Amino acid sequence: MIITIDALLDAAQLNKIQSSLQTAEFIDGRATAGWHAQLVKQNQQLSRTSTLAKSLQEIVQTALQNNALFEAAAYPQRVHSLLFSRYEPGMEYGRHVDNALMGSGDRRDRADLSFTLFLSDPDRYIGGALVIEGACDEQAYRLPAGSLLLYPSSTLHRVDPVEQGYRFACVGWVQSWIRDPAKRELLFDLDTARRSLFTREGKSIEFDLLSKTYANLLRRWSE
């Protein structure tokens, strides 16, 4: 399941991040890639531990926590490993799959879902599409600044070469309460249906039955 969340950031949040990134110091993005992804990763990123990165991470984390669609689609247990990246002309991130586990030592988080928060409007750069491969085809995304794409970490994906301009983005990962993507999609559909029913009919018998089923499936499947 791939979800687009329009305008995750409000104007003030987006402006704060964009203005901060314009003058930020970036490092080689290969530092955080897996050994095989390093071969195809050509971009720059903020150091995760820098004061600026931490302050911008807080803005994004707050926006995610306050977004009902993100909560309903991801069932986030932990949102982790946020990175702010920059692509200059000629840079790309070739075909790869994200690491299943991230972190080191005793603290490792599972990557069930990945997200890309676009921080540059599409008319500010040429190329640089995020391309997600499926079994039979592939889909390319270039969303407005402030919008987010949420997709399974199990997919093969890439960022096409930037031909002109600069592409800024924030990427991150989610360890979900619902590990199985098929179960997660069933819960999302069921929750969407019961909320739609409530909007039309209020707290009906049918709504209560759907809510009972939803709650008990969530109780059974969460981990």
Swiss-Prot record:
This is PKHD-type hydroxylase Synpcc7942_0015. Its cofactor is Fe(2+); L-ascorbate. Residues 78-176 form the Fe2OG dioxygenase domain. Pfam families: 2OG-FeII_Oxy_3, PKHD_C. 2-oxoglutarate binds at residue 167. InterPro entries: Oxoglu/Fe-dep_dioxygenase_dom (IPR005123), PKHD_C (IPR041097), PKHD_hydroxylase (IPR023550), Pro_4_hyd_alph (IPR006620), Pro_4_hyd_alph_FE2OG_OXY (IPR044862). Keywords: Dioxygenase, Iron, Metal-binding, Oxidoreductase, Vitamin C. GO terms for molecular function: 2-oxoglutarate-dependent dioxygenase activity; iron ion binding; L-ascorbic acid binding. Binds 1 Fe(2+) ion per subunit. Its EC number is 1.14.11.-. One of its GO terms (biological process) is intracellular iron ion homeostasis. Fe cation binds at residues 96, 98, 157.
